[in-house]
A protein has these predicted regions:
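FAD-binding subdomain of flavoenzyme oxidoreductases
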Residues: 1-148
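C-terminal substrate-recognition/cap domain of FAD-linked oxidoreductases
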Residues: 108-112, 118-287
């Protein structure tokens, strides 16, 4: 009734939502590694995920903590509401990566499952068109639950691994999701499709059912692991730029790759400009 759950830090992220779903609830933060990452790890890193765009990161979903200090003292930090008197120590500890204390319990916010959810895949022949679409969707007044981008190199890996139905010849795809009340979602989808078409989308596919929706998301969430099919090793980069600068930044990444003979795949949270260029290499090859 109070839309809260008390969990221990070792609980796997996805297991919490799986337990809540039959009752009509879920836990929002959904890192791509949610099948294996823990709530405690998420708290330590202040983890986000695809749905950060509309719902925020872990700190927006934690009300309180039970911690053990370096002196061995057990303390209750925060509480059951956001407006606990005093300093926001919960906010200080979330994202501290275990350097300030040991967390033993976490009070998290849970939310109702949306009445309606629509997942779309916009297919583009240029990275510029895809990235310009992202900023215009937000500028139009629509804030989707998620906007993710994958480029051609990543799509090759994802399809070989997951067979999610993504086109192998696209320069980029946008995985977009709208959720909320049924009428509102229908309006959001119409607006999103319109913006995609304005920016020369080859096609916008709307998941026909829950199974297809889950398959689209499986492709995205398994993307990092799938890269192992095209490269034995890679470095993950993590940076944030304004959405309006995505076209320029992605072009520069491409130019740098050409100049230095690098292979780089792009898979990232486009909606909030959170880039994850993956530099592919093989340490067994001299010089790489």
């Amino acid at each position: 009734d109070n839309l809260r759950a008390v969990v221990q830090p070792g609980l796997v992220n996805l297991h919490l939502s799986n337990a809540l779903n039959p009752q009509g609830f879920y836990y929002v933060p959904d890192p791509s590694s949610q099948r294996s990452c823990t709530i405690g790890g998420n708290a330590g890193e202040n983890a986000g995920g695809p749905h950060t765009l509309i719902y925020g990161v872990t700190t927006n979903h934690v009300f309180g903590l039970e911690i053990v200090t370096t002196e061995g003292e057990i303390l209750q930090i925060g509480g059951w509401t956001y407006d606990t008197p005093g300093y926001d120590l919960t906010g200080l500890l979330i994202g501290s990566e275990g350097t300030l204390c040991i967390v033993t319990k976490i009070i998290v916010r849970i939310v109702h499952l949306a009445e309606a959810v629509k997942t779309m895949v916009g297919i583009f022949d240029t990275m510029d068109d895809a990235s310009n679409t992202v900023s215009e969707i937000i500028a139009s007044g629509v804030i989707p639950a998620a906007i993710e981008m994958m480029d051609e190199m990543i799509l090759q890996a994802v399809e070989a691994d997951t067979h999610a139905g993504y086109p192998m010849d696209a320069a980029a795809v946008l995985l977009m999701e709208a959720e909320g009340l049924r009428e509102s979602v229908a309006e959001q989808v119409e607006q999103i499709v319109s913006v995609c078409n304005k920016h020369h989308a080859r096609e916008v596919r709307i998941a026909a059912n829950e199974a297809e929706r889950q398959l689209f998301w499986a492709g995205r969430k398994n993307a990092f692991g799938a890269v192992g099919r095209i490269s034995p090793e890679f470095y993950v980069q993590d940076g944030v730029v304004p959405r309006t600068r995505l076209p320029y930044v992605l072009r520069r990444v491409g130019e740098i790759c050409s100049s230095y003979g690098l292979r780089v795949g792009n898979v990232f949270h486009a909606g909030d400009g959170n880039l994850h260029p993956l530099i592919l290499f093989d340490s067994q090859i001299p010089g790489e």
